Amino acid sequence: MIVTGVYDCTTGRNELLQCNTFFKSYNGKSIVVICDDYINSPDYIVSLYLNRGSECVNKISSLFVIISADSTGLHIMCDPYGSQWNLFYCVKDGLFYYSTSMKSLLSVCPINRTLNKNAAKIFLKRGFLIDGQTLITDIKCLTCAQELFFNQDGLHVQHYKYQFKICNYSKSDARNMLIPAIEDSILAYFSKADKSVSLPLSNGYDSNLIFNTIRKKCNDKEINVFTIGGVVGRNEIPAVKENIKGIRGVQHYTDIIDKELLRSFPDIVWRLEGSLFEGGVFLQYALGKLAQKAGITKMICGECSDEHQKSRFIKDMFNVTHGKYHPNYRYYSRANPFLTTHFVVLKKSSLMLNSFGIRGCYPFVNVTFTQLASILVSDNLNCLNLAYVHRRH
């Protein structure tokens, strides 16, 4: 999914050079919505946006990017988690260029391609970049809970205040509500018209919960599961084969990562466009390649489940979305579960799958799940484990 455009503040013209997603024109305003439309439809998001402006974010449950332009200026915003899609942008000669693809942006924007050396140092140390920096000096990237405005007064970027609702359920009620809430989120990602469902399947709780929910609620659909193992380290293929043995209607695709995958390193870098680098990208690359070969265009993934169950997640989300965080780079570490969700875990999966023409669906990146998890979570116990223990007793 690629959206590329250029906005001229002197004429108020927004020219879409590429757009294979939802577009609507309303009273002289053009609006592009890239969203998780299984959860919230683009029309619903546009309606909220037109009525509430930036405050629409507090009523939208899905991941999204909104691009709105009229004669007065351009406004772009993304969801609090930073979206599945990057939004790169730069300003050159009074024109504002933007795209969901770095390669596409570079093909239309006549800027000097200068390496951002400070950003490169951070990237080599952390594996990802923050505060909207990229590896190219003049190109920036919209990050979690951010919005930007561009008009004749120039460019203004800020964090909007996301009002996350804290629920006052008892722990007992939250335990009883957790699994049904996750099941509802999973089931929202496919319709009766879908003949099959596809997902990565490991030996962990999150993917098995997705798998068992689909089996239980949609036993009329074929299930395609994908497991990637490794020659070195943990190989979960045998365990997964044992778990699904004897279950009808399941097609199991597998692949093994070995040293030969290193030959694909240039292709991996090309697909991620300098957004991040982490050891897990090799697994994601193998997964995307295997799923593409099988003709899959949509996968339901368990990413971000662990991060949303960390005791610090809500606090870190509040600090980031309200601008109450220390600007020093050392603050941004893997110990921050909210930023890890945005900069590493979600993007690692979504960007790689998107590069193979596969849409990733993420039922654990869900407001209700986060609300319930925040009640149940503790430093030493994963709340999904807690829910399973509770049900077994």
List where the protein language model places each region.
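Cysteine-centered catalytic environments shared across enzyme families
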Residues: 1-255, 259, 265
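ATP-dependent adenylate-handling active sites, centered on carboxylate activation for C-N bond formation
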Residues: 73-75, 152, 159, 164-393
